[in-house]
């Protein structure tokens, strides 16, 4: 028994290094898998911008910034500064902190949020944990300016983490406070210029003290909730390398102790891509990126394009969002959709309607999205072979799963209209599906809600000619999916 115990003690450091035991060094951290398979399978997530900025509900979620722009740039964001003084009062009388008591979140229900996310087809979900404004949405011991002590007086992150995970989804939290110190410079004479508000308006703190608080907050989110995904906004170049290394090693070690495969997302070049996951805000590559990536995309549209709730929001349609999801997934990405709840914690009905319809499409045709991987090309413009075919062709995107290739049409080719899919050649199919020899088509199926339809095909070196059957009804007014099974 003593021999076994000694052997176990000798091997313990090696076991620790094999799983966990990350050091705050890039070489050690490079053992971390930046994008685990669960994320590549999940494809679609939802999060929210919800915070104090939803009280004024004007301009966008950066109201905190624009209300303080009292110089020549005071007209920024639809006259944000001038409007603030007209509606709420001058900055020497009314500061951003005065919105906090109005941010009550009295109708917030974490279970209702999680239900909405799940019904919309999300496989990971969460919310902003802290935006640029310095207000933490969890129960923090490092700042009095947090949702558990002020405003809602609830641990929003803790409640939502439990609700999301109880429904089998992965939990997401985003941190945007890396530029809180430099974002706004409050001036003497303003209501904000008071030491008691220093931890809200970071610029009033000593810089080293503020950096320590930045790391403490990040580590606190990890220790209390250990999200499956932590998203960092831009400006991580403002954080010293040592602190970034300290955070990553702490997070990865905590996750390993819980048996979780976690992700850190970043923008630009703020982290190495072999350790973290690259995020494109409102954008995506136009061809397949060999490394998985994230696209965060907000539901709002038009003049505001706000991430947080504002009065008079214009919205993208469910068709816009589904088409973006299809485009992103076909290029080896995953889509993160942002919603914008009101200050009371409820979602406007028009936002709920949009994501409900996203969910209808995903619950019906999600097999072409979830768990798929890129085909050899993401997209082509298929050409009809009849005189009345659409002159500029039909947009079709590709995904694949095992020996199945999905063609997702965002333009409906119609019935009995032969369409050439030039990228579906035997060589491309064999490469994509890892098949030896010349593949044969086993079945071609137009997916529909009530019944599926068998399609006619001709499969040759020039591609695959697809003809939808005469009796096929238009399966969806958003996008149609044809599944090709090969053998």
Regions found by a protein language model. Give the residues of each.
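Mature catalytic domains of secreted/periplasmic carbohydrate-active enzymes
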Residues: 19-487
């Amino acid at each position: 028994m003593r021999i076994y115990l000694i052997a176990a003690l000798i091997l313990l450091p090696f076991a620790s290094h094999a799983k966990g035991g990350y050091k705050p060094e890039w070489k050690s951290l490079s053992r971390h898998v930046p994008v685990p398979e669960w994320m590549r399978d999940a494809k679609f997530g939802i999060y929210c911008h919800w915070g104090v900025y939803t009280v004024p509900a004007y301009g966008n979620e950066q109201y905190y910034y624009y209300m303080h722009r009292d110089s020549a740039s005071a007209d920024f964001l639809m006259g944000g500064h001038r409007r603030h003084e007209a509606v709420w009062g001058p900055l020497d009388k009314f500061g951003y902190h005065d919105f906090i008591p109005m941010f009550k979140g009295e109708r917030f229900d974490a279970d209702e949020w999680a239900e909405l996310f799940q019904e919309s087809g999300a496989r990971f979900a969460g919310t902003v944990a802290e935006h640029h404004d310095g207000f933490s949405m969890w129960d923090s011991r490092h700042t009095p300016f947090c949702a558990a002590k002020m405003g809602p007086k609830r641990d929003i992150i803790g409640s939502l983490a439990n609700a999301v995970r109880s429904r089998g989804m992965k939990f997401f939290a985003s941190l945007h406070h890396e530029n809180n110190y430099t974002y706004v410079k409050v001036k003497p004479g303003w209501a904000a210029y008071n030491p008691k508000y220093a931890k809200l308006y970071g610029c009033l703190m000593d810089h080293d003290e503020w950096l320590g608080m930045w790391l403490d907050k990040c580590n606190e989110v990890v220790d209390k909730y250990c999200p499956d995904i932590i998203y960092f906004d831009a400006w991580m170049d403002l954080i010293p390398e040592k602190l970034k290394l300290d955070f990553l090693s702490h997070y990865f070690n905590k996750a390993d102790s819980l048996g979780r495969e976690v992700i850190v997302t970043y923008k630009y070049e703020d982290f190495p891509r072999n350790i973290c996951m690259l995020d494109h805000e409102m954008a995506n590559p136009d061809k397949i990126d060999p490394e998985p990536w994230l696209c965060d995309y907000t539901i709002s549209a038009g003049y505001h394009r706000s991430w947080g709730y504002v009065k008079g929001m214009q919205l993208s349609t469910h068709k816009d969002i589904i088409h973006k999801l299809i485009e992103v997934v076909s290029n080896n990405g995953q889509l993160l959709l942002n919603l914008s709840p009101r200050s009371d914690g409820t979602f406007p009905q028009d936002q709920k309607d949009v994501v409900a319809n996203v969910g209808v499409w995903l619950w019906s045709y999600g097999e072409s999205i979830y768990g798929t991987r890129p085909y050899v090309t993401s997209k082509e413009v298929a050409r009809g072979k009849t005189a009345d075919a659409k002159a500029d062709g039909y947009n079709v995107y590709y995904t694949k799963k095992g020996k199945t290739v999905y063609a997702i049409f965002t333009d409906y080719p119609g019935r009995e209209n032969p369409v050439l899919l030039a990228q579906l050649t035997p060589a491309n199919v064999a490469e994509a599906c890892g098949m030896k020899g010349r593949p044969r088509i086993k079945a071609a199926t137009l997916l529909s809600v009530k019944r599926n339809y068998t399609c006619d095909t001709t499969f040759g070196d020039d591609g695959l000619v697809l003809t939808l059957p005469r009796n096929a009804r238009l399966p969806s007014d958003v996008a149609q999916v044809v599944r090709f099974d090969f053998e």
